[in-house]
């Protein structure tokens, strides 16, 4: 497979893609399975309180109540069309890189960590502008993503923006590969597989994220696959963010509900819908909630609109 450096604004999901081959996917699952021999993984300590803000599409923010560690999953904010899909006006703080950085600075976080699932424009489109804007405000900004993508695919772009990759990308610029871990200022990230494709050929990933006593599964863009059950057995996530938009690119509401059931999450939030004519509109959320009621009625489903913040308290779970 040929790997190429990429421009964050160049690729969109409706352009031709380089597919992550089945062979490589199976190898990735083998890595995940091998990680089960490493012993138990326990969630980070904390109160179980989490603020969640959905920015539209597949992009969302996690933070404890004091905003000490802010985690962004993917980086498509001021160019995000998710508000339009709901007929909503985008708030001023999400309208530009500078405005967003100002709003984050006002919250006085110890750090902001940007976790990248893959390089399609509706996830990666604002990445370098975001990192640069936060850095220019003297905010401690870090990032984590698939190791080869971070070290090879976008390495030159960091230099173009005047950024030091080794100081921004966790694990001294290496990122993480499947089954790998990165930890920083109270947040922990573990890479898990996603069945999707990328513009550059580097494999897409999802994340297990531990923050303030809550374990989050972020599916990224993916189809349903059998080893989601292994993710559940291995990591027992409390909260799952799953793509539900269907259409040409990802699983839809029914398969997303099955995914939540397989990973064993006690709470679920649907994302990646209503941001493009190619995916389902706002109705996808209700379709997902109905499917969850059939498949796993005890799972608490939170439906959100772009820009909204939900405050969740998730009781501690006993894990191996």
Set out the residue ranges of the language-model regions.
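Beta-strand-turn-beta hairpins that frame and shape the catalytic cleft
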Residues: 47-50, 64-71, 181-189, 210-216, ...
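Binuclear metal-ion centers of metallo-dependent hydrolases, dominated by the metallo-beta-lactamase
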Residues: 142, 155-183, 257-320
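N-terminal export signals
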Residues: 2, 11, 18-19, 24-43
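Active-site neighborhood of phospho(di)ester-bond hydrolases with catalytic His/Asp-centered motifs
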Residues: 73-74, 111-119, 144-147, 217-220, ...
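Divalent metal-coordination and catalytic microenvironments
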Residues: 62, 118, 126, 189, ...
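Pre-active-site segment of Zn-dependent metallo-hydrolases
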Residues: 65-120, 125-147, 151-156, 197-201, ...
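Active-site-proximal loop/helix segments of hydrolase catalytic cores
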Residues: 195-263
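C-terminal segment of N-terminal export signals and the immediately downstream linker at the start
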Residues: 39-63
């Amino acid at each position: 497979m040929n790997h190429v450096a990429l421009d964050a604004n160049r690729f969109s999901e409706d352009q031709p893609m380089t597919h992550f081959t089945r062979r490589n996917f199976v190898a990735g699952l083998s890595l995940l399975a091998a990680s089960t021999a490493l012993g138990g993984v326990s969630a980070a300590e904390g109160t179980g309180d989490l603020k969640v803000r959905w920015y539209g599409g597949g992009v969302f923010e996690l933070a404890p109540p004091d905003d000490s560690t802010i985690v962004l999953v993917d980086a498509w904010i001021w160019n995000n069309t998710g508000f339009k899909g709901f007929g909503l006006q985008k708030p001023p703080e999400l309208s530009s890189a500078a405005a967003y950085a100002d709003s984050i600075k006002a919250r006085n976080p110890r750090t902001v960590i940007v976790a990248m699932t893959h390089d399609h424009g509706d996830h990666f489109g604002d990445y370098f502008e975001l990192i640069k804007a936060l850095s220019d405000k003297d905010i401690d900004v870090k990032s984590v993503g698939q190791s080869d993508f971070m070290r090879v695919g976008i390495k030159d772009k960091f230099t173009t923006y005047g950024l030091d990759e080794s100081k921004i990308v966790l694990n001294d610029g290496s990122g993480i590969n499947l089954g790998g871990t990165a930890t920083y200022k109270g947040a922990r990230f573990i890479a898990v597989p996603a069945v999707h494709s990328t513009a550059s050929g580097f494999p897409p990933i999802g994340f297990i994220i531990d923050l303030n006593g809550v374990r989050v599964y972020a599916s990224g863009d993916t189809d349903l696959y059998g080893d989601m059950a292994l993710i559940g057995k291995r990591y027992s996530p409390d909260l799952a963010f799953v793509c539900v938009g269907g259409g040409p690119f990802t699983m839809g509401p029914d398969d997303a509900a099955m995914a939540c059931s397989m990973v064993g999450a006690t709470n679920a939030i649907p994302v990646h819908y209503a941001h493009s004519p190619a995916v389902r509109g706002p109705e996808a959320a209700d379709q997902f909630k109905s499917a969850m009621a059939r498949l796993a009625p005890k799972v608490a489903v939170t439906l959100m609109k772009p820009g909204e913040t939900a405050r969740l308290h998730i009781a501690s779970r006993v894990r191996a």
